[in-house]
Amino acid sequence: MEAVVNLYQEVMKHADPRIQGYPLMGSPLLMTSILLTYVYFVLSLGPRIMANRKPFQLRGFMIVYNFSLVALSLYIVYEFLMSGWLSTYTWRCDPVDYSNSPEALRMVRVAWLFLFSKFIELMDTVIFILRKKDGQVTFLHVFHHSVLPWSWWWGVKIAPGGMGSFHAMINSSVHVIMYLYYGLSAFGPVAQPYLWWKKHMTAIQLIQFVLVSLHISQYYFMSSCNYQYPVIIHLIWMYGTIFFMLFSNFWYHSYTKGKRLPRALQQNGAPGIAKVKAN
């Protein structure tokens, strides 16, 4: 326990003071409590509450929710591009800019906004529970939805920006497509003729992980790179690689071996892809 406390204190010494005033960023206790409550609700409390109740329909809510996340994800992508990726970043070795320049502060804001969006997306699983779609609450889904915001919190706390933010930008780009699909599918059968591209959604996920891994792997082949926290590079590489393997396994068993769209790929009552988003 003493070692954990010492590690925590050491990490917090490197906290970026520019992020201190943002919601959830003062201490990891609040966000950890939220995530633990989420895990408890979706794995235990929620199913017990709904056990003897009829499933909620929630169609109107899901339409608004999904299209709101389309808009939010689009905005996040735009802000990442305008705060470095389309201006000063080289797309190779890009250290975090800790200055108070307008562009650097803009990057801090969008890094936090991406983190906050991960907490909003916890509602994905809550919707599953309220609609009694318990089969969609897989280990991969819950693991991803809980671990990503927890780990990203630490990244935003000490290194909001730089080459470590590439995967967040790519993830938000993918979410534009994903939530567009989910929003349309929430309309029911009337929208099904326009959702022919659902079969490509898992492939888009896999491409996302390939892009993230390729980008971050550049670090290992550079003669020098002054990115401030190499541990973040290592974690992103591990994250991209592990989830590529998990999604590949999912693809194999669902599409190649099974020759079918698995039940776990359905959201809003329509065929889709597993709600186990990346990054």
Swiss-Prot record:
Organism lineage string: Eukaryota, Metazoa, Chordata, Craniata, Vertebrata
EC number: 2.3.1.199
Keywords noted in UniProt: Acetylation, Disease variant, Endoplasmic reticulum, Fatty acid biosynthesis, Fatty acid metabolism, Ichthyosis, Lipid biosynthesis, Lipid metabolism, Membrane, Transferase, Transmembrane, Transmembrane helix
Listed InterPro entries: ELO_CS (IPR030457), ELO_fam (IPR002076), ELOVL1 (IPR033681)
Family: Belongs to the ELO family. ELOVL1 subfamily.
Main location: endoplasmic reticulum
Name used for this protein in its record: Very long chain fatty acid elongase 1
Domain comment quoted from the record: The C-terminal di-lysine motif may confer endoplasmic reticulum localization.
Modified residues (N-acetylmethionine): M1
Recorded disease: Ichthyotic keratoderma, spasticity, hypomyelination, and dysmorphic facies: An autosomal dominant disease characterized by ichthyosis due to epidermal hyperproliferation and increased keratinisation, hypomyelination of the central white matter, spastic paraplegia, central nystagmus, optic atrophy, reduction of peripheral vision and visual acuity, and dysmorphic facial features.
Function according to Swiss-Prot or TrEMBL: Catalyzes the first and rate-limiting reaction of the four reactions that constitute the long-chain fatty acids elongation cycle. This endoplasmic reticulum-bound enzymatic process allows the addition of 2 carbons to the chain of long- and very long-chain fatty acids (VLCFAs) per cycle. Condensing enzyme that exhibits activity toward saturated and monounsaturated acyl-CoA substrates, with the highest activity towards C22:0 acyl-CoA.
